[in-house]
UniProtKB/Swiss-Prot annotation:
Positions of substrate binding: R81, R87, N119, R153
Enzyme Commission designation: 1.1.1.37
Subunit structure, interactors included: Homodimer.
Protein name in UniProt: Malate dehydrogenase
GO cellular component: cytoplasm
Pfam families: Ldh_1_C (PF02866), Ldh_1_N (PF00056)
Organism: Haemophilus influenzae (strain PittGG)
Catalytic reaction annotation: (S)-malate + NAD(+) = oxaloacetate + NADH + H(+)
Binding site for NAD(+): G7, A8, A9, G10, G11, I12, G13, D34, N94, I117, T118, N119, M227
CDD domains xrefs: MDH_glyoxysomal_mitochondrial
Molecular function GO labels: L-malate dehydrogenase (NAD+) activity
Amino acid sequence: MKVAVLGAAGGIGQALALLLKLQLPAGTDLALYDIAPVTPGVAVDVSHIPTAVNVKGFSGEDPTPALEGADVVLISAGVARKPGMDRSDLFNINAGIVRGLIEKVAITCPKACVGIITNPVNTTVAIAAEVLKKAGVYDKRKLFGVTTLDVLRSETFVAELKGLNVSRTSVPVIGGHSGVTILPLLSQVQYAKWNEEEIEPLTKRIQNAGTEVVNAKAGGGSATLSMAQAAARFARSLVKGLSGETVVECTYVEGDGKYARFFSQPVRLGKEGVEEILPIGPLSNFEQQALENMLPTLRADIELGEKFING
């Protein structure tokens, strides 16, 4: 099994490289790529950690050597948010970066499972899909927006608020990966009794948690460490699925189009990537209303990505 990280010299990428070196199964090959010349050094650095994961680093304009033979590709390349920016402000720069990298994926490892971390995910996943489609290699079972950080934050905040064991707290999060499109299904959390006045503030805190980190870092970065852990968890789940284990994760994929062309919901992962898209289950009145309210925003985000490729 080979996992490639594109954008491995960045804030998320370096932390992700470390976590994957520690957490991937023994015998996995880990390829680290970034345009920055420091990248082979990042690979040497993590290669000194004693685990049976083999690491190689690549830098320069062309990611092809890192992509050759890859089963899983994680894309975290791009610019990060700064105070006053929202994820959509990143679009102008990151859209072109994702397009360029996916064009290489389409040529070099078209059957790989691709996890998009680069924001704005609602839009960059649509860009990736259209590039793969133009190349004639699009398989919707193999393209994912990594929304796992919304799940991690939900688990953390719910466990804190309700005094639950965080390792046993599970919160499905549906929709997209920015602002109002992030919808934690708090009504489905086991062992949590909710007062009406708790739901809305907690939902808003989860939706705005990325901004909380950006502001707290005072211009010094965005959520890199928690995002890296979220991406590492998703990568481990993908690798388990590809190896024949049954794993369920919430992730942003192209499904039946009931709510939007791309939508984050629980997905059973397997040997072909998406094995089955699971139902979102019963919603509270608050959640149903929030879902209906977010859809125009989510659909517009997706359309922006489609138009970026198709004009």
